[in-house]
């Protein structure tokens, strides 16, 4: 959500490549220690940073599938940062695995 709301279109391969390249050039991917994982209530570039449950916002399942497909992203721990309590969080974790399976994403 943070990057997406800032204008990085992580729903497209080119957008993820651009974001990863910028991170590498600014401070190095090896220094990126975690990713907050959540969908966005608002469209790309809205600069509002309002979180939504996985697959229920403007990033959507297909967008997450693109993002999850990058090995660089897979190597960094993901911290779920979605609205709700334990039950909703468990459903969101399940949704992440469903997206990985549905889109046949190879995971290291």
From Swiss-Prot:
It catalyses: Endonucleolytic cleavage to 5'-phosphooligonucleotide end-products. Its cofactor is Zn(2+). GO terms for molecular function: deoxyribonuclease IV (phage-T4-induced) activity; DNA binding; DNA-(apurinic or apyrimidinic site) endonuclease activity; phosphoric diester hydrolase activity; zinc ion binding. Binds 3 Zn(2+) ions. Zn(2+) 3 binds at residues 2, 49, 51. Keywords: DNA damage, DNA repair, Endonuclease, Hydrolase, Metal-binding, Nuclease, Zinc. InterPro entries: AP_endonuc_2, AP_endonuc_F2_Zn_BS, Xyl_isomerase-like_sf, Xyl_isomerase-like_TIM-brl. GO terms for biological process: base-excision repair. PROSITE patterns: AP_NUCLEASE_F2_3, AP_NUCLEASE_F2_4. It comes from the Bacteria. Belongs to the AP endonuclease 2 family. This is Probable endonuclease 4. It comes from Thermotoga neapolitana. The gene is nfo.
């Amino acid at each position: 959500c943070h990057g997406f709301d800032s204008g990085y279109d992580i729903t497209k391969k080119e957008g993820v490549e651009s974001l990863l390249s910028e991170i590498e050039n600014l401070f190095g991917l090896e220094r990126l220690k975690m990713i907050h994982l959540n969908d966005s209530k608002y469209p790309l570039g809205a600069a509002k940073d309002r979180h939504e449950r996985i697959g229920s916002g403007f990033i959507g399942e297909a967008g997450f599938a693109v993002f999850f497909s990058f090995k660089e992203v897979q190597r960094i721990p993901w911290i779920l940062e979605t609205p709700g309590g334990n039950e909703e969080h468990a459903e969101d974790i399940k949704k992440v695995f469903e997206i990985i399976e549905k889109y046949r994403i190879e995971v290291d």
